[in-house]
Amino acid sequence: MNLYRRYGWELTLAALLVLEILLFGLSNSRMLDINVLLFSTSDFICIGIVALPLTMVIVSGGIDISFGSTIGLCAIFLGIVFQAGVPMSVAIPLTVLVGALCGLINAGLILYTGVNPLVITLGTLYLFGGSALLLSGLSGATGYEGIGGFPAAFTDFANQTLFGLPIPLVIFMLCVLLFWLLMHRTHSGRHVFLIGQSSRVARYSALPIARTLCMLYAMTGVASAISAILLVSYFGSARSDLGASFLMPAITAVVLGGANIYGGSGSILGTALAVLLVGYLQQGLQMIGTPNQISSALSGALLILVVVGRSISLHRHLIYEWLQRRRSRKASA
């Protein structure tokens, strides 16, 4: 009983994930093939890598919607640096530093201006996206053309396995462990929850708000850079639009995973399960021949249903009291 009280939503998500796979398996038996389930994660698991630190950002009461553009910028930067003759062993760490810098720019602007993080990251979304297109043009790859020619050892990396699991999935699992420990087993993680519950109380308690926010947004930038590197390796080319479609699925996964969009609560494990739930939903719909437009609409409907359902769950006692008052009024009338 205590386990269900503590991890009730995560257990619900796990049950829904199993049910989803079984239902799609009735329409297409390939969905029940363990190899298909494992290797199809490479198509969406990079969304999960970004969604994990994004969960911590949202729990802190913030938001970052610029990570898609950060992915594109990091991908193009990796391509340009490689074109310039820099070895991949140096280009990859430099790309991670660019991602961290993008996150620190977000944090710095939020702390310095005091403007809502949504507005700041909306601006940097266009800033980073425009910078990616500019760099793409300077490299000779006009529009959304990619930069190719990467060494085979790099392009094969995201398609290799470790202990029978795809490399991107292994990296995702390591990230889940890392962020779970950071969020639920460290003082920094407790600070994240306290800042999200009340930034004023956190400030009066002398919590390191600036340092914590810088850490969170920098981690989101680093995760975006890691996703960019994996995507470039997976597709074999660096393009400025690689993260363009990540925003909606990532936020859906975070909210579906149990994070309060206003801050103060959230779960890394819940987000990880929600990533798989949303990812397999897209995969399953494609396998049964559902058009992309309908698939996107269903993802949006899922997000709305989750928000409404969580709101009803959190305020069920108020709803119950309201219904009781209505019944009392009808009885007295």
Swiss-Prot record:
GO MF annotations in UniProt: transmembrane transporter activity
Transmembrane segments: 7-27, 45-65, 67-87, 90-110, 118-138, 162-182, 212-232, 240-260, 261-281, 288-308
InterPro entries: ABC_transp_permease (IPR001851)
GO cellular component: plasma membrane
Protein location: Cell inner membrane
Membrane topology (UniProt): Multi-pass membrane protein
Keyword Phosphoprotein: no
Family: Belongs to the binding-protein-dependent transport system permease family. AraH/RbsC subfamily.
Function in brief: Part of the ABC transporter complex LsrABCD involved in autoinducer 2 (AI-2) import. Probably responsible for the translocation of the substrate across the membrane.
The protein's assembly and partners: The complex is composed of two ATP-binding proteins (LsrA), two transmembrane proteins (LsrC and LsrD) and a solute-binding protein (LsrB).
Protein name according to UniProt: Autoinducer 2 import system permease protein LsrD
Protein source organism: Yersinia pestis
